[in-house]
Amino acid sequence: MEIGRLRARWLTDYRASQMRYRHMLGPALAGLVLSATADAQTRDSTRSSSRATCDSPCPKRTPNASARPRAPKPEWPVRAPAPLPGSILPNNRILAYYGNPLSKRMGILGEVPPDEMLDRLQKEVTRWAKADTATPIVPALHLIVTVAQGHPGKDGMYRARMDSSLIERVYGWAQRKNALMFVDVQVGKSHVRAELPWLEKYLARPNVHLAIDPEFYMKTGKKPGTVIGSMNDDDINYAIDFLAGIVDKYKLPPKVLVIHRFTQNMLRNYKGIKLDPRVQIVINMDGWGNPPLKRGSYDRYVYAEPVQFTGFKLFYKNDKRFAGWRLMTPEEVLALIPRPVYIQYQ
C-alpha cells in the first residue's frame, strides 16, 4: 500500500470531515460547502425567529389536522435475544483506538509510535474504569482495513485493501494488551458482499470483530468524499448473517458489529435490521464537534432510532478544533441515554 495513495485518500477524508461537521449542525445550516484547501468552514446564514405576542389574550389555535404527529418515545433497552455465553455486551464496555498505521491523520492508532499508543490506551482504560466502576473496560484496536480512495484503482472500486502484514502487525499489538481488534471496512464503490469474505480468516479468531462505515459506501456512484454514503437494512443483515455463519463455523463466542453513523441517511430502514444473538450490533455516533453538537447528534440519530447497543466516538483533535470546543469527559458520555457500551477515540 503506497503512502501517497493514503495521503490522497486523506484529502477526500478531510473534505468528508467538513461535511460531517456541517451535517451535525442539522437545521442550523443550509447547504454543503466542500473545500480542498481551506481549514475554515463556511457557514450559511440562519434565519432568526421571534415568538409572536398579542396585546390582548391570543385566540386559541385550531389544531392543524395535517400537522406531523409527535413521534413515539424510543424504546430502550431494545427487546433483543438474551446474550449468549461469551457475549461481550452489555456487561462490558469496549474502549477502542481507531486509525491506520500508514497515516498519522487517520486516527490515534497511527498517529504515535505503537508503544506510546498502547500506553495511552491503557491510561484511557483506567480513566473510564474509574468513571464507571460497575462495568469492566475491554480495550480494543480499531483498524481500517479497507480504505476509501479518491481514485478508482485498478478495479474501479475506489477502495484499497490493506495487506496481511499490516493487519497481522496491528493484531500483534492487540495481543500484547489482551485487547480486541476490529477490522473496519470503507466499501467505496464496491459492495459489502464483496468486501467481507476476504476478512473471514481474521474474523475466525475469537477476539476479532467487524465494523462498517456507511459514510464511504457509495451506492450513488459518486466518488468517496464528495457526498456521504449510506447503508440500508439489507446491507447490515448480510453482514449479520456473514458473522453469524463464522460464529457457527468456527464455534466462536458472539461477534460485535459496529456501524458508524452521524446523519439520518447513513442508515436507512433501521427497523428492518434483524437481531441475532450471535451478533451484537452497535450504532456508533461518529460525528465530531463540541459537546452540545455531539449530544444532539446522538439523540437524533442513535437514541431516536433504537437498534441494539450504542457507541460514541471522541476525536482528540477535531472535537477541540475551534475556540470554545473541548473533548467530552467519560462522565459526560456516561450521562447519555442510553449509556454507550462502545467508546472510540480517533
State what each model feature region is.
Residues A52-P114:
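N-terminal module-boundary/linker segments of secreted carbohydrate-active enzymes
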Residues S45, T53-S56, T133, S164:
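Coil residues (strongly favoring Ser/Thr
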Residues A38-A40:
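Boundary at the C-terminal end of the N-terminal hydrophobic targeting segment
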Residues I94-A96, P136-H142, N178-F182, N207-A211, ...:
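Structural preference for beta-strand elements that scaffold enzyme active sites
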Residues P27-V33:
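Bacterial N-terminal signal peptides
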Residues A134-A179, K189-R205, H209-A211, M218, ...:
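Chitinase-like catalytic core of GlcNAc-active glycosidases
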Residues T226-I343:
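Surface-exposed substrate-engagement region within the catalytic domains
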